[in-house]
């Protein structure tokens, strides 16, 4: 099958990560405000370099790899603004999950909706998932709002289900079925 990359949206380019993305990724993942709702704290340059080594291989969901992770760049400037992913959580039940991190300078401009929509499309249309979920810390209103704007429904609010950096935190779970995706796409085309 031919590579689908890069993927172009109205304002973004989505492509696999490259070694030269190191500085831009350190500028994102090295920030406390980016990591405050994640399982880890700010990442060092060495941590990010190690991640990039793994991310560079996550370009399709195959029998050997169960994740697709893409860099989002602004068209025209080629500034890397975020990290978007979709991965398999169950082969048997055709389940997946999406994730996203956007540099704070580029939040609130609709870029995350653009890129995350591509990841849902990849999950449902290219990878054949029946259901795609997304999770976030309940205090992360921006992520919860993004998943709702994507058309994902809130399915659960788990209370104190994770110990993150010494604090018990909950999880909001959102999801969308392939039939819901298809209906939303049909409405968008009408």
Regions found by a protein language model. Name each.
Residues 100-102, 108-125, 141-149:
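Conserved acetyl-CoA-binding loop-helix of GNAT-fold acetyltransferases
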Residues 1-105, 122, 126, 167-190:
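GNAT-family acyltransferases
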Residues 17, 133-135, 153-170:
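Conserved catalytic-core motifs of GNAT/GCN5-like acyltransferases
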Residues 44, 139, 162:
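Positions that flank functional sites
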């Amino acid at each position: 099958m031919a590579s689908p990359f890069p993927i172009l949206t109205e304002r973004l380019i989505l492509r696999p990560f490259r070694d030269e993305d190191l500085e831009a990724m350190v500028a994102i993942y090295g920030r406390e405000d980016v990591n405050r709702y994640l399982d880890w704290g700010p990442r060092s340059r060495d941590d990010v370099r190690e991640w990039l080594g793994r991310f560079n291989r996550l370009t399709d969901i195959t029998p050997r790899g169960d994740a697709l992770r893409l860099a989002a760049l602004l068209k025209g400037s080629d500034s890397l603004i975020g990290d978007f992913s979709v991965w398999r959580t169950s082969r048997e039940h055709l389940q997946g999950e999406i994730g996203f991190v956007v540099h704070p300078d580029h939040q609130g401009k609709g870029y995350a909706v653009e890129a995350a929509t591509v990841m849902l499309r990849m999950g449902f249309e290219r990878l054949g998932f029946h259901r795609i979920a997304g999770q976030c810390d309940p205090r992360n209103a921006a992520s919860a709002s993004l998943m709702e704007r994507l058309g994902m429904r809130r399915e659960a609010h788990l209370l104190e289900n994770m110990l993150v950096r010494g604090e018990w935190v909950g999880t909001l779970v959102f999801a969308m079925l392939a039939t819901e995706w298809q209906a939303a796409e049909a409405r968008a085309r009408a």
